Structures are given as structure tokens and as C-alpha cells.
């Protein structure tokens, strides 16, 4: 019913409805295959199936669905998940691959290092090489357009 609701609400033909299945850890491979087949039959444009435990399960899902709908792979840094490169994921038949949390984890580690340096030395001078410059930070965050809006709508 949720897929039908999404299809009924879709106004843009390019809007992609991705069916997500997290049942592997709880119910196992057979249930995942049944659920994903139901999603495909219900009209899902893409499948995002969390497969974490083994290459056999990953290959089974890919084999079953890669020719039916595009598959999405969520690349997890978890030690529970086989460490696959984007090329390996593509070779299995997945069409999209998301490295969803790696940059946040790297940023958190750098924040810890910077804050430890500040705590120990009272300055950030020892970690300046790990930081981007102010101009780059402003550009990344498109601060010039925000400044333009501030000036346009200032009271």
C-alpha cells in the first residue's frame, strides 16, 4: 500500500520510488527475496536491500533482482558488512552505491583531533593543516547567496 501511495502521489515522471528492505537480520534471505519480489510487482523503481552478513546473501539478492530493477548498495563501514569497493558492487549488478556516513566519521575524527590539540596547547596552530580555509568554507556553504539575501531583505 505504501508503494501504491507513493505512485499515486508521484507528479514527476523522473521521481524514483525506492523500496527499502531491512528484513535480512530479522527474517533471513527467503523473506527478503519474497518482500523484494512483492516490491517489484507493486511497481518499485529501485530496490535498496540491506544485506549485511555474507557475500552469499549479497550475490543472491543481486542475482534475483539485477535484471528486474536497479539495485542500490549502501556501503557501510561496519565490520559486519563485507568490505566491497564501488567497482565490486557494480560488478555484482548494483546501479548505485552510497558511502553514506564515511565523510561524517572522518569529520568527527578530525574534530576530536582539533579539539584535543586546543585542549592540550590552548591553540589550533598545530592542526591548521587539517582545516580548510575560511574562503573555501564560505564557498562550500554558499554563504555569498545567503549574504545577498540578507542584504536584499534587510530591514
Regions found by a protein language model. Name each.
Residues 102-155:
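Extended, intrinsically disordered, low-complexity segments
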Residues 1-75, 79-99, 106-109, 115-116, ...:
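Alpha/beta enzyme core
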Amino acid at each position: 500500500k505504501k508503494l501504491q501511495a507513493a505512485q499515486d502521489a508521484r507528479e514527476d515522471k523522473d521521481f524514483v520510488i525506492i523500496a527499502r528492505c531491512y528484513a535480512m537480520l530479522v527474517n533471513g534471505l527467503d523473506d527478503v527475496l519474497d518482500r523484494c519480489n512483492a516490491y517489484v510487482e507493486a511497481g518499485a523503481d529501485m530496490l535498496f536491500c540491506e544485506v549485511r552478513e555474507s557475500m552469499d546473501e549479497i550475490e543472491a539478492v543481486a542475482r534475483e533482482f539485477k535484471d528486474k530493477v536497479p539495485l542500490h548498495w549502501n556501503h557501510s563501514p561496519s565490520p559486519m558488512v563485507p568490505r566491497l569497493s564501488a567497482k565490486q558492487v557494480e560488478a555484482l549488478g548494483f546501479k548505485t552505491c552510497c558511502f553514506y556516513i564515511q565523510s561524517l566519521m572522518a569529520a568527527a575524527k578530525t574534530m576530536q583531533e582539533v579539539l584535543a590539540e586546543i585542549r592540550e596547547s590552548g591553540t589550533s596552530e598545530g592542526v591548521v593543516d587539517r582545516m580548510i580555509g575560511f574562503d573555501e568554507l564560505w564557498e562550500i556553504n554558499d554563504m555569498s547567496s545567503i549574504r545577498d539575501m540578507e542584504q536584499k531583505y534587510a530591514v
